[in-house]
Curated annotation (Swiss-Prot):
PROSITE patterns: SHMT. Catalyzes the reversible interconversion of serine and glycine with tetrahydrofolate (THF) serving as the one-carbon carrier. This reaction serves as the major source of one-carbon groups required for the biosynthesis of purines, thymidylate, methionine, and other important biomolecules. Also exhibits THF-independent aldolase activity toward beta-hydroxyamino acids, producing glycine and aldehydes, via a retro-aldol mechanism. The lineage of its organism: Bacteria, Pseudomonadati, Pseudomonadota, Alphaproteobacteria, Hyphomicrobiales. It comes from the Bacteria. HAMAP family: SHMT. It comes from Brucella canis (strain ATCC 23365 / NCTC 10854 / RM-666). Pathway: One-carbon metabolism; tetrahydrofolate interconversion; Amino-acid biosynthesis; glycine biosynthesis; glycine from L-serine: step 1/1. Its EC number is 2.1.2.1. Its cofactor is pyridoxal 5'-phosphate. The modification N6-(pyridoxal phosphate)lysine is found at K242. This is Serine hydroxymethyltransferase. It catalyses: (6R)-5,10-methylene-5,6,7,8-tetrahydrofolate + glycine + H2O = (6S)-5,6,7,8-tetrahydrofolate + L-serine.
Length: 438
């Protein structure tokens, strides 16, 4: 073997066999530190969850090497016979999980799945209705700073001021007045049951499509803990992470063959090129997990835990927007503790409790300050926390917020936060992740 060939072989051996730690210790270190953070902190961000080792393996597989523009059996590249199997499994499992006739599993994100529906069913300048961001909607539901708010005429609906519940009579009135081409239901910070049947009746009355973004509650729908929108909506979108407990990505479901064709064309070639086959593999694995009986128990536990957490927080003098929760999340009004979302998020973070500041309906504070925090139970429930643990977590949150109220500063109460942090580390130590003890 020549010297040049030997050098090439040595380089190839390193390329295919050296570890991440050997090749890039900086990235390895950041990942290791993130794993430590996840192990030792309580994750209460409602849109986050923890995937199984099987999902991690699928997403970290050699499928990341394969380009596969198009759809199974109709690719623009050769060598797709095995990724076709992967995508077909993901599609069939998604259809079974949600009792849908058609599924597109290629959207790379929640934003892109919603963009694909707009591209399929609307023209720039068309009118659509969506839940106002300040009432628990999403940026892609018509926020002025988002493409959805820039390209279309958006009519936003919201919640009532007295009870923070959706006012369906107001939704109907706005629909009759504005004649939208599409009505979008679903949100990111609404803790009550959605009346899909009523939304469809309103949509039919004005000749609009009904689109449901069930990204936050898809796992609860799959687990039988929230009514399914699929029988009522013309088209449903959902992310595949959050309560569904899969990899980060999107999916579109429909029972209408004509809409399905438009959706497929909108996703590819309209919006995306090659799909992320390693992510689609992770989606397929997560769907298989969600089809198991254990997932129904998981979904029930998510809701039970959320209700327990909400009641515990209320017992410590905190207000829960709308008075409680029917799903996996809650908005906590911090004004009884004279705290802002910004201060509370930082103080809880120092105590190893992760959440996000969030505006509440009719919030007097600025979006980067807010009067509330959003809390969710999917990740903690995945970890094994039950009602007892979430009651303890509620007490720990109140402890930090009471300390923050006394301190009345951005720095918080270091002694209280350190004491709570030690309790959090002890709690998380009883529920190890990925086989790790300690």
């Amino acid at each position: 073997m020549s010297q040049a060939n030997a050098a090439t072989k040595a380089s190839s051996d390193v390329f295919f066999n050296a570890s991440l730690e050997d090749i890039d210790p900086e990235i390895f270190g950041a990942i290791r530190n993130e794993l430590g953070r996840q192990r030792h902190e309580i994750e209460l961000i409602a849109s986050e969850n923890i995937v199984s080792r099987a999902v991690l393996e699928a997403q970290g597989s050699i499928l990341t090497n394969k380009y596969a523009e198009g759809y199974p059996g109709k690719r623009y590249y050769g060598g797709c016979q095995y990724v076709d199997v992967v995508e077909e499994l993901a599609i069939e499992r998604a259809k079974k999980l949600f009792s849908a006739e058609f599924a597109n599993v290629q959207p790379n994100s929640g934003s892109q799945m919603n963009q694909a529906v707009f591209l399929a069913l609307l023209q720039p300048g068309d009118t659509f209705m969506g839940l106002d961001l300040n009432s628990g909607g999403h940026l892609t539901h018509g926020s002025p700073v988002n493409m959805s708010g820039k390209w279309f005429n958006v009519v936003s609906y919201g919640v009532r001021k007295d009870d923070h519940l959706l006012d369906m009579d107001e939704v109907a009135r706005l629909a009759r007045e504005n004649k939208p081409k599409l009505i979008l239901a679903g949100g990111t910070a609404y803790s009550r049951i959605w009346d899909w049947k009523r939304f469809r009746e309103i949509a039919d009355e004005v000749g609009a499509y009904l689109m449901v973004d069930m990204a936050h509650i898809a796992g609860l729908v799959a687990g039988g803990q929230h009514p399914s929108p699929v029988p009522h909506a013309h088209v449903c979108t959902t992310t595949t992470h959050k309560s569904l407990r899969g990899p980060r990505g999107g999916m579109i479901l429909t029972n209408d063959a004509d809409i399905a064709k438009k959706i497929n064309s909108a996703v590819f070639p309209g919006l995306q090129g090659g799909p992320l086959m390693h992510v689609i593999a992770g989606k397929a694995v997560a769907f298989a997990e969600a089809l198991k009986l254990e997932f129904k128990l998981y979904a029930k536990n998510v809701v039970d835990n959320a209700r327990a957490l909400a009641e515990e927080l209320k017992s410590h003098g905190l207000d829960i927007v709308s008075g409680g929760t029917d799903n996996h999340l809650m908005l906590v009004d911090l004004r009884p503790k004279n705290a802002t979302g910004k201060r509370a998020e930082a103080a809880l973070g120092r105590a190893n409790i992760t959440c996000n500041k969030n505006g509440i309906p009719f919030d007097p504070e600025k979006p980067f300050v807010t009067s509330g925090v959003r809390l969710g139970t999917p990740a903690g429930t995945t970890r094994g926390f039950g009602v007892a643990e979430f009651k303890e977590i509620g007490s720990l949150i109140a402890e930090v917020l009471d300390g923050l109220k006394v301190a009345n500063s951005d720095e918080g109460n270091a002694a209280v936060e350190q004491a709570v942090k030690e309790k959090v580390i002890a709690l998380t130590g009883r529920f190890p992740m990925y086989g790790y003890q300690g």
